[in-house]
């Protein structure tokens, strides 16, 4: 592969409520046995990119623990491999990252010491499967300075006002780019995936940062007169930017067509856990549910996603909910439209009920 990778994994969001108090968005557990970053990291490896940097910032401990061994993504290599960059203070720098452009600039030695001609930049906070080598070839064929991957969401329920919105002219060349516009001119949203020449990226960063320009979209994409093209992606994609989007993403994988992302090659890799298979006792009734290994089910579970080592007691009902690792649902409980974080205990006969529009969130380690 003629490119190196950069995964931006430093984000946090108040819209995720208690779910982000103890972890970065990129470390969010999704779909029974994965973390959000597994998707972008697997995409890198599966696309032939063998040198990848993960740039972290907020609540990075669990993320660094998850990435402690690069071998699961075939990135334990003598040449290339997996790099994890965190903010650091020095005599020359006493700031945290002040924007995406700044986070890359503070690790510019990674770019300068590489020899590959291109860089693929993406977020570690979205769930999707993509072959970046196809985007790179498109970028080369267009002789583009920068290629942005986008998706047309006119046939979805996504609110375009939450994203960067773009319009394109002849040959799919970028005409306008607005971040979270009040009056959107199209339904083409940026997926935060970029391809750019390594030397050009270095030049743009070295011009921008000393002037106090730290934002990647505003200060790198829009402020410079460069040839930018769009690459349309029509596969499944969702980002974890709110409680509702987190719930939606997990529920989407109850659909077998979406689940093909996980069951068809190339596979999405993750840090494994050596647990026994899930156990379904005689009183269990499970319908349209993903159940993680090591779980024990005595009650009724419907339209839900259960992570590893979840216990559901006899007579309990779990419906339209996400139950994270090592949580305990007592006998006779009713859990509906809820997101239960890790290591939560719901005592016998308790009710935790939200709505489809506003799922209730129970933070990590709580006892109800």
Predicted stretch roles:
Residues 1-4, 199, 206-368:
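Left-handed beta-helix
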Residues 1-253, 358, 362-364:
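Unchanged
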């Amino acid at each position: 592969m003629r490119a190196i990778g950069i995964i931006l994994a430093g984000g946090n969001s108040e819209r995720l409520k208690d779910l982000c108090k103890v972890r970065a968005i990129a470390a969010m557990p999704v779909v029974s046995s994965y973390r959000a970053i597994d998707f972008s990291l697997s995409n890198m490896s599966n696309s032939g990119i063998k040198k990848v940097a993960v740039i972290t910032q907020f609540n990075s401990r669990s993320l660094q623990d998850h990435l402690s061994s690069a071998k699961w993504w075939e990135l334990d290599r003598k040449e290339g491999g997996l790099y994890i960059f965190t903010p650091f203070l020095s005599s020359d720098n006493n700031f945290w990252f002040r924007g995406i452009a700044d986070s890359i600039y503070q690790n510019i030695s990674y770019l300068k010491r590489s020899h590959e001609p291109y860089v693929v930049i993406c977020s570690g906070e979205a769930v999707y499967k993509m072959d970046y080598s196809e985007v790179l070839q498109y970028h080369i064929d267009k002789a583009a300075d920068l290629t942005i991957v986008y998706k047309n969401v006119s046939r979805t329920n996504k609110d375009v006002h939450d994203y960067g919105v773009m319009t394109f002219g002849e040959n799919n060349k970028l005409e306008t780019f607005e971040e979270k516009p009040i009056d959107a001119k199209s339904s083409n949203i940026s997926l935060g995936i970029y391809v750019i020449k390594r030397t050009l990226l270095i030049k743009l960063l070295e011009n921008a940062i000393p002037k106090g320009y730290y934002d990647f979209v505003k200060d790198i994409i829009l402020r410079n007169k460069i040839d930018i093209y769009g690459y349309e992606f029509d596969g499944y994609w969702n980002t974890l930017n709110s409680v509702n989007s987190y719930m939606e993403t997990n529920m989407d994988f109850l659909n077998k067509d979406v689940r093909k992302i996980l069951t068809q090659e190339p596979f999405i890799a993750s840090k494994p856990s050596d647990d026994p298979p899930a156990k379904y006792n005689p009183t269990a009734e499970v319908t349209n549910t993903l159940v993680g290994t090591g779980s024990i089910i005595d009650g009724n579970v419907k339209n839900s996603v259960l992570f590893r080592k979840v216990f559901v007691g006899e007579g309990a009902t779990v419906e339209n909910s996400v139950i994270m690792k090592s949580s305990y649902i007592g006998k006779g409980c009713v859990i509906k439209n809820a997101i239960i974080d890790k290591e939560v205990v719901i005592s016998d006969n308790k009710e935790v009920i939200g709505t489809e529009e506003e799922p209730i969130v129970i933070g990590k380690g709580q006892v109800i």
